[in-house]
Amino acid sequence: MRRNKRERQELLQQTIQATPFITDEELAGKFGVSIQTIRLDRLELSIPELRERIKNVAEKTLEDEVKSLSLDEVIGEIIDLELDDQAISILEIKQEHVFSRNQIARGHHLFAQANSLAVAVIDDELALTASADIRFTRQVKQGERVVAKAKVTAVEKEKGRTVVEVNSYVGEEIVFSGRFDMYRSKHS
C-alpha cells in the first residue's frame, strides 16, 4: 500500500528514532520508495545522515558514561571508554596546536590529551591528577593524528588513588607516554 508523503514522513521519523543506525537503502526498501525520496524526506525533516546519527548516539553515550568531567573539557575526541579500565581518544594536530615557525605540536597539547583521558577513564565524579611521570619520544607535526590509549593499572579505592598509564601514537610510533597517579574520592 502506497502512503502519502505526510504519513511516510511520520513513519520515517518514528523508524529512525527507534533504529538510528538504519541506512537510507533499508528505509527505501521498507517504504517502497527510492533512496533519493528518503534523502529528500530526511532533509525536509532535518534528520541527519547515518554517519552523523551514529556520531550523535556515540557522543550521547559517552556523555552519560564520563563522570569526572564534561566531554567538552576532554582534549581530543574519545572514541572508546570503559570506566576504570581503558579509553582511547584521537587528536588531529591543527595549526592552532603547533609552533608557527616549525609546525611542531606544542607539548602541552599532547599532555592535555593524555591527562584529560586519564581523568575521563576514572569511574568517579571527582578525579584529579596527583602526579605524572611523562616522556615525549618524538616530535608531532601539523596534520598528524595522535591516538592516545589509557589503561588503568591499579585502583586503590580505600586510599583514593588510581594509576593510569597513557601511551600516545602517530600510526604505530609512540610519541608520548605517561604514568598518571590520580586522586579520586574514597566513597565511589
Swiss-Prot record:
Family: Belongs to the FapR family.
Gene that specifies this protein: fapR
Stimuli inducing this protein: Autoregulated.
Top-level taxonomy: Bacteria, Bacillati, Bacillota, Bacilli, Bacillales
UniProt xrefs under InterPro entries: HotDog_dom_sf, Thioestr_dom, Transcription_factor_FapR, WH-like_DNA-bd_sf
HAMAP family: Transcrip_fact_FapR
Keyword annotations from UniProtKB, A to Z: DNA-binding, Fatty acid biosynthesis, Fatty acid metabolism, Lipid biosynthesis, Lipid metabolism, Repressor, Transcription, Transcription regulation
Gene3D superfamilies with a match to the protein in the record: Hotdog Thioesterase, Winged helix-like DNA-binding domain superfamily/Winged helix DNA-binding domain
NCBIfam families (UniProt xref): PRK04424.1 (NF003359)
Function per UniProt: Transcription factor involved in regulation of membrane lipid biosynthesis by repressing genes involved in fatty acid and phospholipid metabolism. Binds to the 5'-TTAGTANNNNNTANTAA-3' consensus sequence found in the promoter of fabHAF operon (containing fabHA and fabF genes), yhdO and fapR genes and prevents their expression. Its action is probably modulated by malonyl-CoA.
One family name in Pfam for this protein: 4HBT
A Gene Ontology molecular function term of the record: DNA binding
CDD domains: hot_dog
The keyword Transcription appears for this protein: yes
Protein name from the UniProt record: Transcription factor FapR
GO biological process: fatty acid biosynthetic process; negative regulation of DNA-templated transcription; negative regulation of fatty acid biosynthetic process
